Design a protein with these regions (language model features):
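Gly/Pro-rich, tryptophan- and cysteine-flecked surface segments typical
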Residues: 1-157
Length: 157
């Protein structure tokens, strides 16, 4: 499977959570990397560029920059293959998320989540990575497959 040249992070959290993102050029060529943060209506609120040598890492300054006006989504593009992760923490809670991409099959038209637990206040954030408007349908089922809740909405690119 080829490594991606574009990766996505659905949320860079403003407020109490502290975020950092690391991007690594995994090719043998110098890479030109562009990070773009967008608000909830897909308007660009911040961007930064960086050149990376082979296997060099970059930490785009998302904390206090990309999230200055609130939560943002992040797209990272490169002319060479890249991998990346988002690390965030609040007090002693630490979360890590790999960058989503078409190549790693973490961006798709259909996603399945094995469990939602109401006591944990689970929530989903959908990020449209297409140039077209998307119709989003969410169907929650119980353990017997019966529909418990259905939601539908549109997401612009």
């Amino acid at each position: 499977m080829p490594a991606p040249k574009t990766i996505y992070f659905s949320q860079i959290a403003a407020g109490a959570w502290n975020d950092w993102v690391r991007v690594i050029n995994i090719s043998n060529q110098r890479a030109k990397v562009l990070a773009i943060a967008r608000n909830h209506v897909a308007q660009t609120v911040w961007s930064a560029e960086h050149n990376l040598n082979p296997f060099e890492a970059w930490h785009p300054p998302v904390q206090g920059q990309a999230d200055r006006r609130g939560d943002a989504s992040l797209e990272i593009r490169s002319d060479q293959p890249i991998v990346g992760e988002r690390h965030c923490h609040s007090g002693t809670q630490v979360l890590d998320f790999p960058g989503a991409s078409l190549e790693t099959r973490t961006v798709a038209n259909r996603l399945f989540f094995p469990e939602l637990y109401s006591g944990a206040y689970d929530w989903l954030r959908v990020f449209n990575v297409s140039e077209m408007e998307a119709l989003i349908s969410i169907v929650a089922r119980d353990v017997n497959g019966r529909i418990v809740r259905q939601l539908q909405g549109r997401a612009i690119s």
